[in-house]
Structures are given as structure tokens and as C-alpha cells.
């Protein structure tokens, strides 16, 4: 079995060594420009078109939860990866736990009004504030994939009303489900904390815009953990400046690294991290990929295959 590997920043030799340990008999090599030798599987992140073009592969694995970089290249180069070759993404591999930690910590930060107390501290003011009630602090999650389900599960013990919006209706315990465009407005109107975990598709690009934000209750919060292109940053800033939004926590941006001239840097009600909410953990990812390849070789069912029509 021949496997080609490409990632611009990962420790390639570590991945090759560990993959060969978990897949006895497999030969894994780093792909470099001009390498047209046959391969059975490709493990990639932001791959050059020529890496995949014209190859008779059994499957391609994206080394992250998102596949938008591959799908965007396919729109211009459809022969890069024919539909006959399945494309897989990492379903969890430790990302679920990281998203849980991030989401719970930020929701509690807002619920306990730590942002307000930080502002009071900077103003040298000693002022106890009224508490928020958990049963009135509704958290709405956009996106009902593996990560959305994990985040909802982690928030349940805290007593917040939970709701989810997705393409199709979900039956999650203790979570109110809203489905499709027709129910998006109702979902937004009752949401105090909006958590974005949507996939990056043509339909979801720019979805968090002026029209959508206007439907939130006043003094709501936005937590973006998905992709920067989901948020129209000018509209987000306008909602913050008008008081419609009380705060925003952003892990992803329309341009990364965030340009120095962006007004997001200096905004007092914007907190941010540099796209680190959930990173690929090598050992968990290697184990998942090795197990999935082994199941494919045995002809057994697997999960994680991307529906290219939907984009996730």
C-alpha cells in the first residue's frame, strides 16, 4: 500500500513514522512537486492541484475537519479529484473536546459578566452587578455536525436553554431544534449567545450579516468557531457599536492572519484567538486515519466521507 502525504506545516517525518507503525506494510512518503509515482491514498492539507490530478486513488483524507480548500479548488479543476474517489475529513480526533472547552469557557465568561467586570476594573470602579439567570441565557448553535453536537452536550449541565439550527431537524436530548431557512428567524429571535459551527459552503458564506444580527435580542453575544467567511465583519462591528451585540469572541477571520489595520484588534468588546479553537492532534488523527484505511481495505463501512454536493 502506497500513501502520499502533504501538509505545509506538520512534522512530516513524525506522521510518516507513526502511520507506518499503525499500518504495517504501508509505505508512506512525503509528496513533492514532480512526484507522479502511483499511490493508493493521499493525506493532504491545502494540496497543490498537481498532487491529486490524474491519480487512481482509493481515497483522499483531509487533515482537518474542514474541506473547503479542496472543494474550492475542485470548482476550477474538476479533474483534480473525480467523484469516484471518496474524500474524507477528520470527524473528531480530539477536536470535539477542544471545542467543548472553548465554548463552555466563553459562555460562562459572558454569563458571569467577566467582560463587564474587566471593563469596571480598567475604570477603577468597584461595582457589583446583577446576576444573569441561567434559564434566560439561551444558547443557540448554528450547525449540527459532530462538533455542534459535542458543544451542545457540554453546555447541558449548566442549565442554559439550548437550541440548534441546521439544514434538517435534529432529535437531541434537551435541545430545541430549528430546521431550514423558514425557521432561522425564530431561532435567532430567542438566542442570547450565538455559537457558529456551520460548515463552509456557498450557502453559508456571509450568513452572519446585518439582517441576521438584527433578529437577535439586544445585548446578545456572538462566538464564531467555524470559518471567518461566515461573518460579515463590517456588519458585526456595526452591531457591536450600536449595542445590538454586547460582545463577540472570534477564533476565525475572513483574512488570516488578521490584517493589522483591522478595527477588530482595538474594539473593546471583541476578544479573539488566532484560529486555535480546535487543532488537529497528530496521534488521534493518525489513529483515526489508520483505522479508516484498514476498514476500507477490508471492505467495511466507514464514516466521515464528504458529501460534495452539500460541501461537508
From Swiss-Prot:
It is an enzyme of class 1 (oxidoreductase). It is found in: Cytoplasm. The active site is at 227, 275 (proton donor). The keyword Oxidoreductase applies. The keyword Nucleotide-binding does not apply. One of its GO terms (molecular function) is NAD binding. Its EC number is 1.1.1.79, 1.1.1.81. GO terms for cellular component: cytoplasm. SUPFAM superfamilies: NAD(P)-binding Rossmann-fold domains. It catalyses: glycolate + NADP(+) = glyoxylate + NADPH + H(+); (R)-glycerate + NAD(+) = 3-hydroxypyruvate + NADH + H(+); (R)-glycerate + NADP(+) = 3-hydroxypyruvate + NADPH + H(+). Keywords: Cytoplasm, NAD, NADP, Oxidoreductase. Catalyzes the NADPH-dependent reduction of glyoxylate and hydroxypyruvate into glycolate and glycerate, respectively. Belongs to the D-isomer specific 2-hydroxyacid dehydrogenase family. GhrA subfamily. This is Glyoxylate/hydroxypyruvate reductase A. It comes from Klebsiella pneumoniae subsp. pneumoniae (strain ATCC 700721 / MGH 78578).
